[in-house]
Curated annotation (Swiss-Prot):
GO BP annotation list: fibrinolysis; proteolysis
Molecular function GO terms recorded: hydrolase activity; serine-type peptidase activity
EC number(s) per entry: 3.4.-.-
Family: Belongs to the peptidase S1 family.
Stated role: Cleaves the carboxyl side of basic amino acids, small neutral amino acids, and Met residue. It is also a plasminogen activator.
Domain (Peptidase S1): residue spans on this chain: 1-25
Subunit architecture: Heterodimer of a large and a small subunit held together by hydrophobic interactions.
More details: Activated by sodium dodecyl sulfate (SDS).
Keyword Membrane belongs to the record: no
Keywords from the UniProt entry: Hydrolase, Protease, Serine protease
Enzyme class: hydrolase
This protein's name: Fibrinolytic enzyme large subunit
Entry superkingdom: Eukaryota
């Protein structure tokens, strides 16, 4: 997920948080 705002089915909050912070996704 690029942007990490909307969670896709199967994504969980800690994954979204790490994606937003790292910015590598």
């Amino acid at each position: 997920v690029i942007g990490g705002t909307n969670a896709s089915p199967g994504e969980i909050p800690w994954q979204l948080s790490q994606q937003r912070q790292s910015g590598s996704w």
